[in-house]
Amino acid sequence: QSLIMNGDRILALENFKGTSKMIDLFSNNKSFNELIFVKFKKLNQINEVDFPVIGPETIKKLIKIKIKAMILFKKQTLIVDKINCLKLLKNNNINLIVL
């Protein structure tokens, strides 16, 4: 449901352990300076059971790894506490791209 890229290279793809564990892989990041986080809906995903969600705690983790941009797909991601999320992104100069 999510991945992390640097430029045009995919560095990490979320697995069964979840988004937080994937982000934690970059907790000591010093090598990559153009990280992009992408949140998406899996093919044939059942919305009633598992819907892509992002909230302030995830964004705080992304801030720690110095993410430059976050890409979400319109009507495919639930944003928890949207106002706080947008403030966190703005205050940390993270670009939000909605496709």
Give the positions of each predicted feature.
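C-terminal binding/interaction regions
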Residues: K60-A69, F73-L99
